[in-house]
Amino acid sequence: MTLLISSLFGDRPYVVVLGIAQDGGAPHAGCEKRCCIELWESGKEEKVSSIGIVNPLTKQSWLFDATPDFPSQYRILTENHNTELVGIFLTHAHMGHYTGLLHLGREVMGKKNVPVYVMSRMKRFLETNGPWSQLVSMKNINLKLIENNKYIKIGEQLFVEPFLVPHRDEYSETVGYRIIGNEKSLAFIPDID
């Protein structure tokens, strides 16, 4: 499902909703509830929660969370919207939010220096735990340290503001993002307690 907010045919940045489900997608593995059974039987699925920001003028895009559905979400963002992925913002270290980074490594895409925006605990987690640390050491990803409530400029009149949110923080802090444009803004908070 792709939902576009703002003008699809204009020059203004817009949001692409790439997924709405929890960490394991829908249907979840092993789920025997009616909602899952209906999805299994129909062949339909919901991708894990993620959004993309597209700047049609520069043909650049940014991904918010690298989910287990990264291959199809990357394709939607780059091919369907004719952009180059120039950055990934991670929210936290639970399986549905960062495991897609593996596709950037040498076994799949072999990318070089993809900017990945993270707060300090998430940065340390990725640097000190394999296989993520290999992505760092081989320079597939370039970790960009961000701070609570400090704006990051990603385009002309386009900013991202990270902010801490309460959640289970076993391995990293949990971050929400406010994406601020010239006329509109939105918040991306895939998990919160």
Features from the language model and the residues they span:
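Structured loop/turn residues at beta-strand edges in well-structured enzyme cores
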Residues: 83, 96, 139, 156-158
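Active-site environment of divalent metal-dependent phosphoester hydrolases
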Residues: 24, 94-100, 125, 168
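Bacterial N-terminal signal peptides
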Residues: 1-6
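Core dinuclear metal-dependent hydrolase active-site scaffold
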Residues: 8-77, 143-193
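Short, glycine/charged-enriched secondary-structure capping and boundary segments
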Residues: 30-33, 77-80, 102-106, 130-133, ...
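A short, active-site helix/loop in glycosyltransferases that binds the activated sugar's phosphate group
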Residues: 121-131
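Active-site metal-binding motif and surrounding structural segment of the metallo-beta-lactamase
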Residues: 54-117
